[in-house]
Structure formats: C-alpha cells, structure tokens
Amino acid sequence: LERAARAGIPGYVVARKDFASNREMTIALVDKLRELNIGLVVLAGFLHILTGEMVAAFPNAILNVHPALIPSFCGAGYYGLHVHEAALAYGVKLTGATVHFVNEEPDGGPIVLQKAVEILEGDTPEVLQRRVMEQAEWHILPQAVSLFCEGRLRVEGRIVHIL
C-alpha cells in the first residue's frame, strides 16, 4: 500500500479479520473491485483461498504466483515456506515458480508462465524461497501481467495460448 501511495495509486483494505468468514470477506472484496471497475486481479503473497464468488466475478482475470512448478507442491497447505520445505524434503533438483489463472481449485487454474530454479546443495527453505522469488517470481509475474494487459493470453480449457 505504501508503494502504491508513493506512485499515486489509490489503495483499499479489505481485511479478513473484519469478517466472520472467508466467504463474507470475498464478497466484500468482489463488491469493491466491481465498484472500481477492475479488469485484472493479481495475487502475490495472498494467503487466503478465494471463494467461488471471486472466481465467478473474474473468470480468467485473476493471476496468482505460486512458488513451485505446478503441479508439484501445490494445493491446500502448500504456501510460503511450506512449499520450499516440501521440495527440499522430497529431494527434487529443480523447483521454480508458476503464474496461473485462479479457478475454484487451489493452484489448479490454467498455467500462464513457469520458470525453473535449481536447488543447490545446502539450501535451506529460507534461502531457496529468496532465490525462487528473485530468479523466477519477480520475472514471470510482471511478464504475465503485461501479456494479460496487452490482450495476448487466450485460455482454452487448461491451456493458455500466448499470442
């Protein structure tokens, strides 16, 4: 919010703690986004599961960045450091990040972009998390947003075509 304010972009808060349920928060969020005539919702570090109301209001217009190469280490319970802990515990040699459209299944929407990151000997979850952010997430999320805003993404079922 501070960065947006410095750039002259208005910011609004719809806080989960202000609502009795996740559904109520999501409905309030949808109402605010519609009021502002928002065409794209970007989730980055958003750790709440959105309910069907949000997905229905913004079909193929919600982008999420996930810190793994979906379909690995994704879905319920796989967020933040948990993702990197799981990748290290499994012994995979590559991880990375995925930008995908949000649907009603956690981390289950059509994949827009992915970028791989090598796991190095001695990595900790914290070190790996930072490297995935720097080498993958921070590159592919703005790229996906640009593609969307340029009208260069076409979704057919699970497949996202880049035009």
Where are these regions (language model features)?
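One-carbon transfer enzymes
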Residues: 1-163
